[in-house]
Amino acid sequence: MLSVIKQRDKEVLAHLPNKRKIAGNKAHLETYKKLAKYTVSASIFKFLSISHPCPLRAKTRLFFEVSLGNRIADCVMLTSCGETRICYVIELKTCMTSNLDLISDIRKSQRSQGLCQLADTVNFIHNYAPLGRQAWTVLPILIFKSQKTLKTLHIETPKFPVNLTHTSEEKLSCFLWSRADVEIRKKIHLAPKPKRIFKWDSLLDSTSTEHSAYRQKLIERNKKKCFTLQNQTSKFRDRTNKKSNDQLRARQANARPCKKKQHNNKRLRNNRKHGGKVSRLTTTTSFSSEAAFSNYPVSTHKL
């Protein structure tokens, strides 16, 4: 009976147009990005409409598109606050309209498919999670969200017989991290690159060029002003350089000692060391003595 229901649900969802599937994938990616942006655990619980015993103090870790056996869990969230440790396995279903009609065939098939996925993922975590001493409660949640506003329309927590596993936080986080989709992780955490503007885009642009022409005129005026200022500053620098060079030369000339050239053979007249004045006195005395002796008569005696 269950196999017949599963087959019918697959057929109903397979007949949906490709546009609906693409819109659903985009809504999933937007919800992942919004969850990754939150820094406080209380805002995450509010966005998902999930109740937690200590929403403000809980530590959260998110993993997206985790492959658990034959199933892929949309989101797995680990929360720990003291001794209360919960592993939320979240399955997202999106709707085009904001009004949820669970009686329709599409909503019934979405609900039954989501419950089957949650049952398989919970069993896989219970059987293949790494062993540890900490007790973790595995809590499956089915959430219906609007594609446009990402508002929660319906939430359901099914009860399965197995919902407790013994593991550790580090081991379980490594186990989920290794099984998460790498491409989805890059799309969520990496920022989009800015678009490059090529030359042919500017040729096809229909915007007016009045603003650009006015801007070009302003640029030319500024260039002229800059050129005149540069000339003025260069002239002022030349003047200051000339003045400084003249001052340096004058200082160097004053600092040099003035030395008169003297020949070794010649002697200075007024230099006492060489006896210039003494020679003059000797000559005068000699002449005066001769004059004195000339005044007195010389006696000549013949023997």
Curated annotation (Swiss-Prot):
Record's protein name: Protein UL24 homolog
General function of this protein: May participate in nuclear egress of viral particles. Plays a role in the dispersal of several host nucleolar proteins including NCL/nucleolin and NPM1. Since deletion of host NCL/nucleolin negatively impact on nuclear egress, UL24 supposedly acts on this process through its effect on host nucleoli.
Keyword Methyltransferase: no
Factors inducing expression: Expressed late in the infection cycle.
Entry's localization field: Virion; Host cytoplasm; Host nucleus, Host nucleolus; Host Golgi apparatus
Entry similarity comment: Belongs to the herpesviridae UL24 family.
Residue spans of biased composition, Basic and acidic residues class: 235-249
Keywords, comma-separated and alphabetical: Host cytoplasm, Host Golgi apparatus, Host nucleus, Late protein, Virion
Membrane spanning stretches: none
